[in-house]
Swiss-Prot record:
<feature type="active site" description="Schiff-base intermediate with dihydroxyacetone-P">
    <location>
        <position position="212"/>
    </location>
</feature>
<dbReference type="InterPro" id="IPR000741">
    <property type="entry name" value="FBA_I"/>
</dbReference>
<dbReference type="InterPro" id="IPR023014">
    <property type="entry name" value="FBA_I_Gram+-type"/>
</dbReference>
<comment type="pathway">
    <text>Carbohydrate degradation; glycolysis; D-glyceraldehyde 3-phosphate and glycerone phosphate from D-glucose: step 4/4.</text>
</comment>
<dbReference type="Pfam" id="PF00274">
    <property type="entry name" value="Glycolytic"/>
</dbReference>
<protein>
    <recommendedName>
        <fullName>Fructose-bisphosphate aldolase class 1</fullName>
        <ecNumber>4.1.2.13</ecNumber>
    </recommendedName>
</protein>
<dbReference type="InterPro" id="IPR013785">
    <property type="entry name" value="Aldolase_TIM"/>
</dbReference>
<keyword id="KW-0456">Lyase</keyword>
<keyword id="KW-0704">Schiff base</keyword>
<comment type="similarity">
    <text>Belongs to the class I fructose-bisphosphate aldolase family.</text>
</comment>
<keyword id="KW-0324">Glycolysis</keyword>
<dbReference type="GO" id="GO:0004332">
    <property type="term" value="F:fructose-bisphosphate aldolase activity"/>
</dbReference>
<dbReference type="GO" id="GO:0006096">
    <property type="term" value="P:glycolytic process"/>
</dbReference>
<feature type="active site" description="Proton acceptor">
    <location>
        <position position="175"/>
    </location>
</feature>
Length: 296
């Protein structure tokens, strides 16, 4: 593990950019960016266009290590190059710590939750991540209802995979998302915090994780997790809130920083001039940084 990157993620001021939409969500990501489905005719063309979009973001002067601590990439992005370097190396040279989304999507909903689908060949993927200079990983589950046993199952699955990732020398970001429209959201979050704490308490002293959580309904509901010795950092997803709304509620939660995806790129468009594109990206970065660092 790279100690300098570890220290930056643990103590740095800033947030983590999530650029990891995968195959299933790519057409929507492109559409939001102003690229219509009739502009590409197969997956290869689609992934080339999305790589162009991500390259435009990553190479923008606004996108630098001053306010952005890390960036989460999709597997295809990790394997491609930006200006002649693998994406992870390009980011690292900019002072941005690279992470890789490793999950293969969500299983069907059962008992009010969606577990992760199995991740075949995870060991090979982690080997490749190490070769590409990736620091950590991210994997997502989804919680829709307050079912204590099912929530515990989600957390247990996440930590089981996390231990494999730690053994490979990488830092896992564990993401059990709570749906922002869940009717017992606050109660779900209390049960989730309890389940996560129990798993954290069982980690060895040299096993570190990060957490990516929905911004809690009860302010500072996750403070105990943020302060846990086995947790490097706790980051928040925007989860369907607008950027303004996400920033507003994030600002109230001490020690919680952003890891926004859609809320970061929502004002960017393929038709914008570079000047306009960079200005909109800078604006988004500045407001998300502010909500992550300057607490209410």
């Amino acid at each position: 593990m790279n100690q300098e990157q570890f220290d930056k993620i643990k103590n740095g001021k800033g947030f983590i950019a999530a650029l990891d939409q995968s195959g299933g969500s790519t057409p929507k990501a492109l559409k939001d960016y102003g690229v219509e489905e009739n502009e590409y005719s197969n997956d290869e063309e689609m992934f080339n266009l999305v790589h162009d979009m991500r390259t435009r973001i990553i190479t923008s002067p606004a996108f630098n290590g001053e306010k952005i601590l890390g960036a989460i990439l999709f597997e295809q992005t990790m394997d491609r190059e930006v200006e002649g370097k693998y994406t992870g190396s390009y980011l690292a040279d900019k002072g941005i710590v690279p992470f890789l989304k490793v999950d293969k999507g969500l299983a069907e909903e059962a008992d009010g939750v969606q577990l992760m689908k199995p991740i075949p060949d995870l060991d090979k993927l982690l080997d490749r991540a190490n070769e590409r200079g990736i620091f950590g990983t991210k994997m997502r589950s989804n919680i829709l209802e307050n079912n204590k046993e099912a929530i515990e199952k989600v957390v247990k699955q996440q930590f089981e995979v996390a231990k494999e990732i730690i053994a490979a020398g990488l830092v896992p970001i564990i993401e059990p998302e709570v749906n922002i429209n869940a009717k017992d959201k606050e109660a779900i979050e209390a049960n989730l915090a309890e389940a996560i704490k129990a798993e954290l308490d069982n980690l060895k002293k040299d096993q570190y994780v990060m957490l990516k959580l929905t911004i809690p309904t009860k302010v500072n509901a996750y403070s105990e997790l943020i302060e846990h010795p086995q947790v490097i950092r706790v980051v928040a997803l925007s989860g369907g809130y607008s950027r303004d709304e996400a920033n507003k509620i994030l600002k109230q939660n001490d020690g919680l920083i952003a890891s926004f995806s859609r809320a970061l790129v929502s004002d960017l468009n393929a038709q914008q001039s570079d000047a306009e594109f960079n200005e909109k990206l800078q604006e988004a970065i500045d407001t998300i940084f502010d909500a992550s660092v300057n607490k209410a």
